[in-house]
Swiss-Prot record:
Binding residues for substrate: A98, D99, I100, K101, G141
Gene label: Echs1
Source lineage: Eukaryota, Metazoa, Chordata, Craniata, Vertebrata
Residues where N6-acetyllysine is found: K101, K115, K211
Identification of the protein by name: Enoyl-CoA hydratase, mitochondrial
Residues that bear N6-succinyllysine: K101, K115, K204
Pfam families, per the entry: ECH_1
Source organism of this protein record: Rattus norvegicus
Length: 290
């Protein structure tokens, strides 16, 4: 959750001082952003691509960036042509954490009454699948942001960590909860209590990421996966995502009940009828998203 460039290896030679985000401003739909880059990708422009773009600050997650990210997510969520979203950063860093200067003078009262970081998890309320394409550092808030996504693809040199303990605090945007669910108690506890990072290879072995790709092809691979998802029925994809996510919130019995209800619900859709008819007739399904 915290900005962690000061915690990167001494081999980096110099420690970059945290860069303060200017006061954020709201953007009208379609306007240019200051901290992110957005575009549509894929043959049918069915993939929304969001790139964090504060390279000098290693994509430190300031308030303005999060506000822009949430707006971009909502824009793609409401776009009927977009079926999935890819979130990425740069080759050096996905995101090295939150902006320290933005939080170092906060008090308990500020955090509690202002619900500090409460808008960070907006991405978890997006119904369309979000794939994190992680190159370089995903530390603190950067790691938490990646874990809020539905799928994580990692570049070969990616590193994941929750080093907040080294700053005298703990993760505050879901790090202790999502990391533990993803990799298990022992590894999560070790990472959170020591601040140690894990490599992309270790992250895959632990179940944090699903696939690893060369740095230069990572984003394209994520886009291809998103495009494959976007070819399916959007309403059915949303149901499937809801059901899988429920596995982390419910007991097995409760989860199975929800899955059954959602399964039954697919029979109220035209896309379920089209999908099964296409299978029987040995043709490609033509989903209409209803």
């Amino acid at each position: 959750m915290a900005a962690l460039r000061a915690l990167l290896p001494r081999a980096c030679n110099s420690l970059l001082s945290p860069v303060r985000c200017p006061e954020f401003r709201r953007f009208a739909s379609g306007a240019n952003f200051q901290y992110i880059i957005t575009e549509k990708k894929g043959k049918n422009s069915s993939v929304g691509l969001i790139q964090l773009n504060r390279p000098k600050a290693l994509n430190a997650l300031c308030n303005g960036l999060i506000e822009e990210l949430n707006q971009a997510l909502e824009t793609f969520e409401e776009d009927p042509a977009v079926g999935a979203i890819v979130l990425t950063g740069g080759e050096k860093a996905f995101a090295a954490g939150a902006d320290i200067k933005e939080m170092q003078n906060r008090t308990f009262q500020d955090c509690y009454s202002g619900k500090f970081l409460s808008h960070w998890d907006h991405i978890t309320r997006i119904k369309k699948p979000v794939i994190a394409a992680v190159n370089g550092y995903a530390l603190g808030g950067g790691c938490e942001l990646a874990m809020m996504c539905d799928i994580i693809y990692a570049g070969e040199k990616a590193q994941f960590g929750q080093p907040e303990i080294l700053l005298g605090t703990i993760p505050g945007a879901g790090g202790t909860q999502r990391l533990t669910r993803a990799v298990g108690k022992s590894l999560a506890m070790e990472m959170v209590l020591t601040g140690d990072r894990i490599s992309a290879q270790d992250a895959k072995q632990a179940g944090l990421v699903s696939k690893i790709f060369p740095v230069e092809t990572l984003v394209e691979e994520a886009i291809q996966c998103a495009e494959k998802i976007a070819n399916n029925s959007k309403i059915i994809v949303a149901m499937a995502k809801e059901s899988v996510n429920a596995a982390f919130e419910m007991t097995l019995t409760e989860g199975n009940k929800l899955e059954k209800k959602l399964f039954y619900s697919t029979f109220a859709t035209d896309d379920r009828r089209e999908g099964m008819s296409a299978f029987v007739e040995k043709r490609k399904a033509n989903f209409k998203d209803h």
